[in-house]
């Protein structure tokens, strides 16, 4: 998600910090990962959000609780891409699992029995959530309204539990 360097990145839901990685010398660059309970997201499983290419190490620690919309890092361009040059951007990923357990070996976090989730599925109000099933939906069912915070911190719609990682006007 392209954004100017230093743009604050927001937690997409209430959660807990489970990983902060410098990732010196790899493609992801500076990274933070959060775990979200089913109660925090309103989804029927545990979700894990991953944010990479941050411009600096986050001012958070593993185990910190974060609120939806809290700043968790700043947009940057950290990470190695060989000879390719890219602009400042957030690489944003969501994983999910029926299990609450995960591991962190100091280089990567891994949800137990976890799977990558199409971010579109994360913002759906009901299933399907599995990417292959989502792909089978007719085009008319693939458009998903995404909740967000206004620049003043007001969630749209009110009561949203999952938001876009950047505020909107």
Describe each model-derived feature in a short phrase.
Residues 11-56, 85-91:
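Zn2+-dependent peptidoglycan hydrolase active-site motif and core
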Residues 1, 15, 69, 92, ...:
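Terminal peptide-recognition signature
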Residues 8-19, 59-75:
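Short, well-structured beta-strand-loop connectors
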Residues 2-4, 51, 56-60:
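Short alpha-helix capping/helix-loop boundary micro-motifs
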Residues 20-21, 54, 75-78, 97:
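Residue-level recognition of beta-strand microenvironments
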Residues 75-89:
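Active-site loop architecture of trypsin-fold serine endopeptidases
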């Amino acid at each position: 998600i392209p954004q100017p360097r230093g743009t604050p990145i927001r937690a997409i839901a209430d959660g807990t910090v489970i990983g902060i990685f410098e990732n010196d010398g790899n493609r992801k660059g500076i990274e933070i990962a959060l775990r979200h309970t089913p109660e925090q997201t309103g989804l029927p499983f545990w979700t894990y959000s991953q944010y990479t290419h941050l411009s600096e190490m986050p001012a958070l620690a593993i185990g910190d609780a974060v609120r939806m919309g809290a700043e968790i890092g700043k947009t940057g361009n950290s990470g190695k891409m060989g000879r390719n040059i890219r602009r400042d951007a957030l690489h944003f990923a969501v994983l999910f699992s029926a299990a609450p357990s995960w591991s962190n070996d100091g280089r990567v976090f891994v949800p137990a029995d976890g799977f990558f989730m199409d971010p579109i599925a994360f913002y759906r109000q009901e299933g399907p959530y599995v990417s292959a099933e989502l792909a089978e939906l007719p085009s008319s069912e693939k458009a998903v309204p995404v909740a967000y915070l206004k620049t003043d911190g007001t969630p749209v719609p009110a009561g949203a539990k999952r938001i876009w990682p950047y505020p909107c006007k």
